[in-house]
Design a protein with these regions (language model features):
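Extended interaction regions within the primary functional domain
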Residues: 1, 17, 79, 134-136
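Short solvent-exposed beta->alpha transition segments
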Residues: 77-124
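Short, low-complexity N-terminal intrinsically disordered segments enriched in polar/charged residues
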Residues: 10, 17-66
Length: 157
């Protein structure tokens, strides 16, 4: 005995419902794709930025590194976002420096600076990766500035 497959016939109402469900799923998928794209960070060269000046960002990075080297944390406070003000102090910097090396020696020079603009969720961030030479060690700084040119993120390696 062979079973014959019979094609189920849909009523016009069932066809409309099926088409409506397909359209709803398609709209949800498109919306999810757009939201995912919007949340992903978009990177581009800082020179192409419409928000930041590459020269201003590099000058601000040099200024901050200079203040850190001079241990002028009072002047540094006006250059960082409020959330960073508590942690940008001598005690925390000494802890961070000790993790890298006990004896950095004197600052010699900034060797390289690489920059980018990062756009995520509509916010623009200027990021700078700085290689600085000290007498006894090479240090890598990562600085990120918000649109007001305030230091929003900082790291040393």
């Amino acid at each position: 005995m062979s079973k014959k497959k019979t094609k189920k016939v849909l009523t016009p109402e069932q066809k409309k419902k099926r088409i409506r469900n397909i359209i709803i799923v398609a709209v949800i998928l498109v919306a999810a794709s757009v939201a995912t794209y919007w949340m992903q960070p978009q990177n581009k060269a800082l020179a192409e930025s419409e928000v930041f000046s590459e020269e201003e960002v590099k000058a601000q990075a040099e200024k901050i590194i200079g203040l850190l080297n001079a241990e002028d944390f009072d002047s540094l406070q006006s250059l960082v976002v409020p959330d960073m003000q508590e942690i940008m102090n001598k005690e925390r910097m000494d802890e961070g420096k000790a993790r890298i090396s006990e004896d950095w020696g004197d600052f010699v020079s900034i060797e390289t600076m690489q920059d980018a603009e990062i756009i995520q969720r509509g916010a623009h961030i200027a990021a700078v990766y700085v290689t600085a030479e000290y007498e006894n060690i090479e240090v890598h700084y990562t600085l990120a500035f918000n649109e007001d040119m305030k230091l929003a993120s900082f790291g040393i390696q």
